[in-house]
Amino acid sequence: MPLSYPHFRKLLLLDDEAGPLEEELPRLADEGLNRRVAEDLNLQLPNVSIPWTHKVGNFTGLYSSTVPAFNPNWLTPSFPDIHLHQDMISKCEQFVGPLTKNELRRLKLVMPARFYPKHTKYFLLEKGIKPYYPDQAVNHYFQTRHYLHTLWKAGILYKRETTRSASFCGSQYSWEQELQHGSTSLNDKKGHGTESFCAQSTGLLARPSAGSAIQSKFQQSRLGLQHKQGQLANGKQGRSGRLRSRVHTPTRWPAGVEPSGTGCFNNLASRSASCFHQSAVREEANPSLSTSKRHTSSGHAVELNSLPPSSVGSQGKGTVFSCWWLQFRNTEPCSDYCLSHIINLLEDWGPCYEHGEHHIRTPRTPARVTGGVFLVDKNPHNTTESRLVVDFSQFSRGTTQVSWPKFAVPNLQSLTNLLSSNLSWLSLDVSAAFYHLPLHPAAMPHLLVGSSGLPRYVARLSSTSRIHDHQHGTMQNLHSSCSRNLYVSLLLLFQTLGRKLHLYSHPIILGFRKIPMGVGLSPFLLAQFTSAICSVVRRAFPHCLAFSYMDDLVLGAKSVQHLESLYTAVTNFLLSVGIHLNTAKTKRWGYNLHFMGYVIGSWGTLPQDHIVHKIKDCFRKVPVNRPIDWKVCQSIVGLLGFAAPFTQCGYPALMPLYACITAKQAFVFSPTYKAFLCKQYMNLYPVARQRPGLCQVFADATPTGWGLAIGHQRMRGTFVAPLPIHTAELLAACFARSRSGAILIGTDNSVVLSRKYTSFPWLLGCAANWILRGTSFVYVPSALNPADEPSRGRLGLYRPLLRLPFQPTTGRTSLYADSPSVPSHLPDRVHFASPLHVAWRPP
């Protein structure tokens, strides 16, 4: 007969009718009983042929393909002019006085941040924008390209101009070395020569459609300038096959010519006369061409002609355009859906390329990307705006893996000890928090994103319209991209983007100027930065509380009026150092703070309502007596694990699920086990703040017996059979709690001190979690433990009670602790203010 739920509750001692604890509790440690209960509840599932369930509610498991939803009406979020002031440290010192070593160390980490991995893989530009939405490829391309352009305009990205220079918008930092008079001087000994930088150059193309013929004729690679064929010439490829294996994509493409999939180099002898003809036509039409000289590494000086931006797009009909987009203007439409119909909608499509306000030196940056990008909804509650996802996963796996620094995440008890109080609370919203922290330009070559341009992107997605080297630039190849889908997509995009369609159709390479979200270093840096800022605020206003985790920043004060004045002062301080706050999203919580998924009040901590609703919904949909895929179990455990500390039996109740996930087996919920879990999560108990106190109750055990010291009283007992020492120590602690009711118990066992009961026999772990709920433990060495003698059966010998004070810990979360306004004179060997010694004490 299967075990019913009432019997199971009684077995776990969750009912008041249970017998003496000293007799009942050791029984739960029996392996045979645990095995029989597991079999009754079907917790050890044999391999069965019943098909697994791969979906429970919103949780999906193995073999499930979730099709991402693309929103063609996504809005690109706007980014404020984010510029963290370089003199932030001096401004903080004006605000609060000399900074502590902890604060200085953290602020220096991000001014600027550095990221130099040992190995970096570079990918072709075609992988710059991921084909995440195959049915909406063109829409996704332009929306992503618009997002990248917005980030560049906001000063968050660098734009690669040449191999060793980049441009950006916004305010400049001192570590960003400006190019002197438009030239980058490189070391000739290394074979680089001197590279003359012209304002119209770009990461891939030296100039749009109206560039000079000389520039079209020569193509630069790492081997110097290579001669190139004319736009419509039919010469041979020359040495392209031999060079391609080494160079892949040239450092700079000729003016306006879209690079093909592999690049194309040509022999000096195979150049066409059409280049010289174009040169003559353009020089007649544009007398304002400016000329600059380029010295190559091979010693040749080549004149490069560059145009003022105003002359772009205003060429005569006789000109042969080398810009893929503008070439359609001079061709006959191939069909009703020819792209030439769209190109002829405007006379002036604007420049092929834009350049930033500042041009700086960079380390050698190849014409490649190191990560792909795609768009998703901003969050589950905001599907109108998009969010850019950057995939730099190469730094988290394989040979290019980087070991990220670890940092403190406040656990539930530390958070409760720190924030559970009778203060009034509000939370601040930092706009684009990650994009506040500047990166050193030397990190740019490792964090490259970009796009290959529309023709190559479309060609990659369409097998019928691939651009081949031998037909590159021919009219037949030009119209091979024309299709109804592309035509309709571009026509719709033209209504929103207008002439930016032309700009976005060109290739671009961008490097991060601020820390990106897709790299494991970024959360660490953000946590260090916000903790240092909160430390400064705490010391400036010692009667208040400022706390942060990542970009969540909360302020607490004793009254609402006090909180409002604090809010004004802190907001002004944050704005003065360049931190942008979204004041519209400031939330005032009253006395119950909502933070990190918890509600924290003077009574303790509970999970937020939306998490409780999710749990109820999960239990409604969990099937009984059906094997559930272990991947689905992972999602269920993730949800239930968050709220486990608020239940009677805690994490031990979930151990059968953990075991099935570890074994990668399916799990079957029996009616009794599901009812047990359901009841556990329907009644949640708050986690209370620990109080300081003096330990008066001690417990100790040997494999055969237990002993207690409660004040001046001593007790002892024996076990029916010898038990493992950790199990015996846990039983002794449970007896001490049940007999004395004390919430402060001294023990010499580290496993009991850790309060993790998942390694004990399952039934014992569940029962002990409920008995010891809310109990704090203090470590006492065995030699000084007053319960040591009773546990060995000797009651006659009395050891005096220790004066053992307990101080609640806030872990390593108290980095913003009360600190002296000037550094104290510590011994020379102490180089930092330990957070353990300067911990903030709750009011």
Curated annotation (Swiss-Prot):
The keyword Nucleotidyltransferase applies. Mg(2+) binds at residues 429, 551-552. Its EC number is 2.7.7.7, 2.7.7.49, 3.1.26.4. GO terms for molecular function: DNA binding; DNA-directed DNA polymerase activity; metal ion binding; RNA-directed DNA polymerase activity; RNA-DNA hybrid ribonuclease activity. Residues 1-177 are annotated as: Terminal protein domain (TP). It catalyses: DNA(n) + a 2'-deoxyribonucleoside 5'-triphosphate = DNA(n+1) + diphosphate; Endonucleolytic cleavage to 5'-phosphomonoester. Pfam families: DNA_pol_viral_C (PF00336), DNA_pol_viral_N (PF00242), RVT_1 (PF00078). Residues 357-600 form the Reverse transcriptase domain. The record marks 63 as: Priming of reverse-transcription by covalently linking the first nucleotide of the (-)DNA. GO terms for biological process: DNA replication; symbiont-mediated suppression of host innate immune response. Residues 347-690 are annotated as: Polymerase/reverse transcriptase domain (RT). Activated by host HSP70 and HSP40 in vitro to be able to bind the epsilon loop of the pgRNA. Because deletion of the RNase H region renders the protein partly chaperone-independent, the chaperones may be needed indirectly to relieve occlusion of the RNA-binding site by this domain. Inhibited by several reverse-transcriptase inhibitors: Lamivudine, Adefovir and Entecavir. Residues 239-249 have a biased composition (Basic residues). Keywords: DNA replication, DNA-binding, DNA-directed DNA polymerase, Endonuclease, Host-virus interaction, Hydrolase, Inhibition of host innate immune response by virus, Inhibition of host RLR pathway by virus, Magnesium, Metal-binding, Multifunctional enzyme, Nuclease, Nucleotidyltransferase, RNA-directed DNA polymerase, Transferase, Viral immunoevasion. Residues 178-346 are annotated as: Spacer. Terminal protein domain (TP) is hepadnavirus-specific. Spacer domain is highly variable and separates the TP and RT domains. Polymerase/reverse-transcriptase domain (RT) and ribonuclease H domain (RH) are similar to retrovirus reverse transcriptase/RNase H. The polymerase/reverse transcriptase (RT) and ribonuclease H (RH) domains are structured in five subdomains: finger, palm, thumb, connection and RNase H. Within the palm subdomain, the 'primer grip' region is thought to be involved in the positioning of the primer terminus for accommodating the incoming nucleotide. The RH domain stabilizes the association of RT with primer-template. Hepadnaviral virions contain probably just one P protein molecule per particle. Multifunctional enzyme that converts the viral RNA genome into dsDNA in viral cytoplasmic capsids. This enzyme displays a DNA polymerase activity that can copy either DNA or RNA templates, and a ribonuclease H (RNase H) activity that cleaves the RNA strand of RNA-DNA heteroduplexes in a partially processive 3'- to 5'-endonucleasic mode. Neo-synthesized pregenomic RNA (pgRNA) are encapsidated together with the P protein, and reverse-transcribed inside the nucleocapsid. Belongs to the hepadnaviridae P protein family. This is Protein P. It comes from Hepatitis B virus genotype F2 subtype adw4q (isolate Senegal/9203) (HBV-F).
